[in-house]
Amino acid sequence: MKELKILVVNNYGQFCHLIHRAVRDLDMDTKIIPNTTPIEDILAEEPDGLILSGGPEMDRAGLCFDYVREIDLPILGICLGHQAIALAYGGHVHSGKKGGYAEVEVEVLEEDDILRGLGPKATVWASHADEVAILPEGFIHLARSDICEIEAMRHPTKPIYGVQWHPEVSHTEKGEELLTNFLEICEKY
């Protein structure tokens, strides 16, 4: 795979630097940017894709809603990034039944490009303090768990994907594969 430029949008989550390192370790050019970076500055970087990191609260999601609606690039939302994608397209987010980080067994419902090779079940590391409760209209439901019905989703026509779990942490089984799948999506786009 050729070297791609991936921008990691910092939503102030504790694992943002791990996302950056995981992408860098896959031999990609990567950079962390604030979630207040103007869209024109992002486009000036000529990235091949964006990853929206997790974060503590939606009030601090900066311009993420604008990014997912207005930037024509592959986007992967992780945890809060996943929730921001849902909200930007009319979905709903609520408090989860189980907050805090824990190991979760995820059932892959549709082995889409982003989840290729992860199914039928995968053990992941996730926080469910907040979670997507209702998919945006037309979005494809990709994975679920006993704790959270919407663990992963994708936009019906754009290369926009969201996962509730953290592929960048070592506790997540096949996390590197998910990130590699995203990079392959970026390369094809």
UniProtKB/Swiss-Prot annotation:
**Which GO MF terms are attached to this record?**
ATP binding; GMP synthase activity
Q: Which domain of life is it from?
A: Archaea
SUPFAM superfamilies attached to this UniProt entry: Class I glutamine amidotransferase-like
Per the UniProt entry, the disulfide pairs are none
What region holds the Glutamine amidotransferase type-1 domain?
A: 5-189
Q: In which pathway does it act?
A: Purine metabolism; GMP biosynthesis; GMP from XMP (L-Gln route): step 1/1
Q: Which reaction does it catalyse?
A: XMP + L-glutamine + ATP + H2O = GMP + L-glutamate + AMP + diphosphate + 2 H(+)
EC no. given is 6.3.5.2
Query: Which enzyme type, at the first EC level?
Result: ligase
Catalytic residue list? 79 (nucleophile), 166, 168
Q: State a GO cellular component annotated for this protein.
A: cytosol
Which keywords has UniProt assigned to this entry?
A: ATP-binding, Glutamine amidotransferase, GMP biosynthesis, Ligase, Nucleotide-binding, Purine biosynthesis
What is its biological role? Answer: Catalyzes the synthesis of GMP from XMP.
What quaternary arrangement does the UniProt entry report?
Heterodimer composed of a glutamine amidotransferase subunit (A) and a GMP-binding subunit (B).
Q: Which NCBIfam families match?
A: guaA_Nterm, PRK00758.1
The name on file for this protein is: GMP synthase [glutamine-hydrolyzing] subunit A
The major lineage groups are:
Archaea, Methanobacteriati, Methanobacteriota, Stenosarchaea group, Methanomicrobia
